[in-house]
From Swiss-Prot:
It comes from Chlorobium limicola (strain DSM 245 / NBRC 103803 / 6330). One of its GO terms (biological process) is light-independent bacteriochlorophyll biosynthetic process. This is Light-independent protochlorophyllide reductase subunit B. Belongs to the ChlB/BchB/BchZ family. Pfam families: Oxidored_nitro, PCP_red. InterPro entries: ChlB/BchB/BchZ, LI-POR_suB-like_C, Nase/OxRdtase_comp1, P-CP_red_C, Protochl_reductB, Protochlorophyllide_Rdtase.
Length: 535
């Protein structure tokens, strides 16, 4: 029944294909019923690349099952002939798991050389997107990475960057720019853009950088245990975390440099990290102290997402913008303990750990924060509630897979996040000004009928900010919910409240009225509630 609703994480196939679709010369064969190739449409729609997804379906049909035959060997032969991949990853589906088919045996009968096949036999019922992706990347690194000499100059591997990653290309560009400024080259980016030969030379780097808790951490751990490679797992999101990240890179690179007999690197002047090479690398420190941003110290924020971005954004909002964090949560059950440790002292209550978007929506409706930082699901929920929302992590939509340069990492990323926070909270004020001062002839009608005013709502829901009626009976919006009615005079007073807090004011006023034993919200009740609630 859960599949009838939105899910924060995709299936195991989604995670597997994110890894293989990122790589060069790697193809996925999914042994599944017809129709499970829907995933190719996701990449074609969202991924801004000229290449077609490297995914084929070995169709499981009832007739074949009745005859005791399988199409998998034939499909593997066709893929080898048509695409000539360096490696074909064979992935099971829920159907093949139920049938208990032996994919290793079927693959062995295909005639394709064993070294060009990898059967990733996970349990598709228990493993979801990120765990499947992280596990497959680990298997690939374990299989192909080989010991070798270090590069003569300082170099790093960037691990965990995958197809459909959040602001993927911009984040990579930001990291490359900062590393180049330090005098550090990039040995391999994996899995994004990497081939099998690139995986072989991973141990040549001096340092692994795996900024995502969800994907890449396991592979970095293996490289550390097997080849003695140090790693950095922190994400450089925000000005202070970026400075700490740069210091960590310098420290670990210089530690390896002592062994290699290479002169140490140092921290350059900060303006060297700016886009023009002359100004401050980020405008956040001074922007946070402007009169405009000082008002944000009273704004309340709620953050929900994956482990990496939830931790980073909570710290950025409180430490660098001075906002109040009223709550945070994650849908990553596997990493909930990590999030709790990182956010100790940042949250007044318990961390919300759930993969049900309805639970998150309920918290937002109860708290009515000034800003929500979440996923595409929270954006939908907030639109219904007229709560400002910005997307900080997957699941996302097309507006988070951009051609332009909008990183979240580094000094540039801090500016992008600050801009989005500011605009998410501030945009929409013109709607309130029209509500408050009148339309000034901007194609709005003062005396619109209820049936005419409903379509004017920005989100497809009836908007109490629309035109008032001449009738004395309360409108549907006035009695929506538990039957509390409002007089026309009280409704008119409510319309003078900014739209982005109007639902919160309505809810608080009705709660006050119930406590006073009132069944109807009048103008007097509204004024009393305002005084009582400190408005």
């Amino acid at each position: 029944m859960r599949l009838a609703f939105w899910l924060y994480e995709g299936t195991a196939l989604h995670g597997i294909s994110r890894i293989t679709n990122s790589m060069k010369g790697v193809h996925t064969v999914y042994h599944a019923p017809q129709g499970d190739d829907y995933i190719t449409a996701t990449y074609s729609m969202l991924e801004r690349t000229p290449d077609f997804p490297g995914l084929s379906i070995s169709v499981v049909r009832g007739r074949d099952l009745a005859q005791g035959v399988s199409r998998l060997p034939g499909t593997l032969q066709q893929v080898a002939h048509h695409y000539s991949p360096d490696l074909t990853v064979i992935a099971p589906s829920c159907s093949t798991a139920l049938l208990q088919e032996d994919l290793h045996q079927l693959a062995a009968h295909s005639g394709v050389p064993e070294e060009k096949l990898l059967v990733y036999a996970l349990n598709p019922f228990r493993v979801s997107e990120n765990e499947a992706a992280d596990g497959l990347f680990f298997e690939l690194v374990k299989r192909f990475a080989v010991a070798q000499e270090k590069t003569p100059r300082p170099s790093v591997n960037l691990l965990g960057f995958t197809s459909l990653g959040f602001h993927l290309r911009a984040n990579l560009t930001s990291l490359r720019r900062m590393l180049q400024t330090l005098g550090v080259s990039v040995n391999v980016v994996a899995p994004w853009g990497a081939g099998i030969e690139d995986l072989r030379k991973l141990p040549a780097a001096w340092l692994n950088i795996a900024p995502y808790r969800e994907i890449g951490e396991t592979a970095a751990g293996y490289l550390g245990e097997t080849f003695g490679m140090p790693a950095i797992h922190e994400a450089p999101i925000g000005v202070e975390p970026t400075l700490a990240w740069l210091r960590s890179v310098i420290e670990k690179i210089n530690a390896v440099g002592v062994e290699q007999g290479v002169p140490p690197i140092g921290m350059p002047k900060l303006n060297a990290f700016s886009l023009d090479g002359m100004s401050a690398p980020s405008g956040v420190p001074w922007f946070a102290r402007t009169a405009d941003m000082e008002s944000f110290s009273n704004k309340r924020a709620f953050v929900f997402g994956d482990a990496t971005h939830t931790v980073s954004i909570v710290k950025f909002l409180r430490d660098e913008l001075g906002m109040k964090i009223i709550g945070a949560g994650t849908y990553m059950h596997r990493h909930a303990d990590f999030v709790r440790r990182e956010l100790e002292g940042y949250l007044s209550g318990e961390l919300l750990v759930t993969d049900k978007f309805q639970d998150v929506s309920k918290v937002i409706e109860d708290e009515m924060p000034d800003l929500v930082c979440g996923t595409q699901m929270e954006r939908h929920s907030c639109r219904k509630l007229d709560v400002p929302c910005m997307v900080i992590c997957p699941p996302t939509h097309i507006e988070n897979h951009l051609l332009g340069y909008y990183p979240f990492f580094g000094f540039d990323g801090a500016d992008v996040i600050a801009d989005r926070v500011y605009l998410s909270c501030k945009l929409g004020l013109e709607k309130h000004l029209i509500d408050f001062f009148g339309d000034a002839g901007l194609e709005y009608e003062d005396e619109a009928s209820p049936s005419e005013s409903a379509p004017h709502a920005s989100n497809g829901h009836e908007d109490v900010a629309g035109g008032s009626t001449a009738q004395s009976v309360p409108s549907h919006a006035a009695t929506e919910g538990d039957g509390m009615s409002w007089t026309d005079e009280a409704e008119n007073m409510l319309k003078k409240v900014p739209f982005f807090v109007r639902k919160k004011v309505r809810k608080n006023t009705e709660n006050f009225a119930r406590e006073q034993g009132e069944t109807t919200v009048t103008a007097d009740v509204f004024r009393q509630a305002k005084e009582s609630l400190g408005g």
